[in-house]
Each structure stands twice: as structure tokens, then as C-alpha cells.
Amino acid sequence: MKTEAMLPAMQLIGWCKNIDRRCAAKFPDIFRPALMRALVKNGFLRPYTETYGWRLTADGYRWLAARGYPIQPDQHTQRAKRRFDNAAVAVTMYAAGISPFRDGIPAFCEQGGYLPAFILRARDGSHLLGSNQVVGFVRMADVLLAVHYPHPDRKVILQREHDCAEAMTLRSGCMDTGYLFCGESYGSIYRSLVGVYEENGTRRKQGYANLFRQSRFAYLLPCDGLGAVQLHLMCIPEFKSKLAPLLGGSAGSMIVQNMPDCDFIDPHYRLPARIMLDMELCRVPYAAWQAQKAGYSGLVLAAFETQKQFLEQLYPPPFYEFAVIPDDIITILKEGGTHAPPV
């Protein structure tokens, strides 16, 4: 087996400790079935189990160390279930060209990338995270996004989550704070964001709904190939401003028309349109209000086909129309950026 073929899978499994088959199947370019079988046969991976997923053996960790990637072997096998969620996020980051291997706050502040919460909890930042549900942090320009993997039965203390995100924003030198909500699909993420109040002693815990609705920046991200493309585009500075002229207009002209949350005038519908590739749902009502105030009878949401299928369930006609952004336009935008994903 060639080192370059082995390294991504070995490094990600060693870093995340446990990766399940569901995650591996969504990124076949990294976790090729033939490769995984060979790694088990050669003693670098333990045989797969439903409880622990894929795990490195001691020889696997030694193989990484010999190639300049020393990673602490697993010490807490009872945490495997939540690690599957953490790994899905980390692998999606990697597939988008965002390094998930930052080993502390100084490296994150200096180099960017994705800082997993499990690194902070294992080292010097446990006091910062406490019992918060955050799974990591990623920087998008001057906005720090606190990454969450919500579940319908998982509750949060809103002020604690806000305080945690704002503290990391200050330490990272970012100017603003937002949230990136991850999951298996847009639908499953959205369902998990619908919560109810629940009294828990003297502290009020509740579902993720208010954390989502109260955020200035909030994005939905599936942990799969589509999510990797979405993240890749989000990393391109001012990607909407660069994409708007390819679709029919410019962001600057929309600002002049007092529609800052719209991105261009759709040439087919002749209506204001908002680019939804980043799945920032919270701004849609603002864009709709601005379009109405400007005298338009509707709003176009421009997205990938898979995103469109989800958005149609939330934003019904006749006010909302939909436009699918062609792959060739996305290719032009990606080729014009400096950020390139490894897979």
C-alpha cells in the first residue's frame, strides 16, 4: 500500500479515534472499501464494530508517528457514540480543504482551519468549554462559527453557549460570532433545531431552536460530499458577490436598491434573488421583507438541486420561486478562488 493512499484515512481515524461506516461511506475517495480491508489485514486498523466503528491499532499509531504524525492513542473508548458525530464534522472539513488537525488555540488563531472541541477538552481549554454542546470552531473571514451537531433530544443552556462562542471569538481575533449546525442532511438538522422548553432544576434548558433563531449568522451543513462543496464555497472570500454577476446582477446594485439581503435580480422571474448555497436560513425573512418593500411580488431562492428540494418544503409558493445554480457556474467560481479541497 502506498503511503499517500493510506495517510488521509489513517490520520483522520487516528485524530478522531472512532469513525463509523456511515461517515466512511459518504467519503469513498478517502475511505475506499479496498483500502479499509487492506488496513485491517495489515494490522493497522481494528476490525469494524457497530459500537466502536473504525479504530487504529497500536501499529497504526506507530505507523503515523514514523511518518511525522504522532497522535495520542485512544484512552476513552466509552465515548465512541458522540465521537461519530465529531468525526463526521472533521472529515467534512477535511474534504472541503479545511484542516481539522489544529492542536490548540494558538495554532488555530495563527493558521485558521477547524479546531475540534475534543482537543480543547483534552488539553488546556476545558475550562472554556465546560459542559457546552459545541463540537468545534471554524473561522470564515472575520466571523468565528461555533460548530454544533444538534439532536432532537439534546438540550442547551443558551447563555452558556453564547458565552462560550463569544469567548472564543475574542481569543481568535474575529469580529463576529455565528453558528454552523451539522447533521446527516438538511432535513435532519432542521428537525433537530426545533425544541421546547424544559425545566432542569434551577437552570432552564431548551432545544436548539432559539440558538438558531437568535444568531446573526447561522448555517446548516450536511456531513457529506455536498456539505464539503458548500464549505469550500463559503471559504471563498465574498463568494456571493463573485457569483452574483454570473447569475444576472451584482450585490452592489442590490444594496443601492435597499435590498442588502438579496444578491441579484433573477433574469427569468424578474424578481430579487438570494443565493442559498451557504444555507443561511435566518436571513430569508429579511430578504423577503426587503423585496416586498421594494415593490416586488416574490423572492427567488437560488441553490443546488438537493438544497432546492429541502427549501421548497419551508418556503411555499406563490411568493417564493426557486432557481437551480448550474454546476458549470460553480466550477467557474471555484476555479477563480485560491482555496482548493484535497478530495
In which residue ranges do the predicted regions lie?
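Short helix-coil-helix linker/hinge
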Residues: K2-L7, N18
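Hydrophobic residues on short alpha-helical segments
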Residues: L7-I13
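Short acidic, hydrophobic short linear motifs in intrinsically disordered regions
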Residues: C16-P28
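Short amphipathic alpha-helical interaction segments
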Residues: K26-N42
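Accessory beta->alpha helical hairpin/"wing" motif in late/C-terminal subdomains of nucleic-acid enzymes
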Residues: R37, N42, R46-Y69
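Short, amphipathic alpha-helical interaction segments positioned at domain boundaries
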Residues: D59-A88
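Exposed, interaction-prone assembly regions rather than primary DNA-binding/catalytic cores
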Residues: Q78-E161
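Long, compositionally biased intrinsically disordered regions
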Residues: C182-V343
